[in-house]
Amino acid sequence: MENVNKQSFQEVLEYVRMYRLKNKLARDREDNNRKIRDNQKRVLLLDNLNQYIRDDMSIQDVRTIIESMREDYEKRVDDYMIRNAEISQQRREIREKMKEQKQAHEVLLKKE
């Protein structure tokens, strides 16, 4: 009986750990979504700025810098999207483990 209680306690601790990790991943995903939006706005801003800059203003170097910045922001957006996909996959895996653990715990309780 003591082994069952000890095992149940360990399972509860593991379940709590997974639940907290799942919530942390959800917060990370939302943070990444915010960063994606921010960087997409920056890309739009740079596109708009680039429309106003003309060659007769003799700032070709500024255009080069703006294009470089735009590429950097686009890369960041891509990186955050990839990270979101990874986080979503981790959350799915944790949800499945939690579901399995909950079912195993219910079976264990029925045996008692």
Curated annotation (Swiss-Prot):
Entry coiled-coil feature ranges: 70-111
Keyword Methyltransferase: no
InterPro entries linked: DUF496 (IPR007458)
Any single Gene Ontology cellular-component annotation: cytosol
Keywords: Coiled coil, Cytoplasm
Domain of life from the UniProt record: Bacteria
Predominant location: cytoplasm
Subcellular location: Cytoplasm
NCBIfam families: PRK05423.1 (NF003844)
Family to which this protein belongs: Belongs to the pole-localizer TmaR family.
Job of this protein: Pole-localizer protein involved in the regulation of several cellular processes.
Protein name: Pole-localizer protein TmaR
Organism: Pasteurella multocida (strain Pm70)
The encoding gene: tmaR
